[in-house]
Amino acid sequence: MKYSLIKYRFQNGSEAAWHRDIAEFIAALDGDPALKGKISYRCMKSRNGCDYYHLAAAADDQAIKTLQERPFFGQYRERTRLAGGGSVEVLPLEIVAETKAPA
């Protein structure tokens, strides 16, 4: 698995509309036969603030390549950039240790 953390501070637009955009992106991931089961995606935000954290996991490099070829990915990436006021950080992650059964 390949993991990435996407983080930014929400700065533009309606938070409710942004949450709908995120849900639509996740639905597109789940609905794409070539990506289903190969990409995991979660979005979280700080409870008392405007900081957002997206955790993405891909089964392999091919899943990432396939995702990057999808028009919905480019559109979502641009919307994320706009939501973050042009400042979005993407951090590749590696697991150091984990429980046997992920929650």
Describe the residue ranges of each PLM region.
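Short S/T/G/P-rich N-terminal loop/turn motif that feeds into the first structured element of a domain
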Residues: 1-70, 82-103
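Long, charge-enriched, surface-exposed interaction segments in small proteins/subunits
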Residues: 72-73, 77
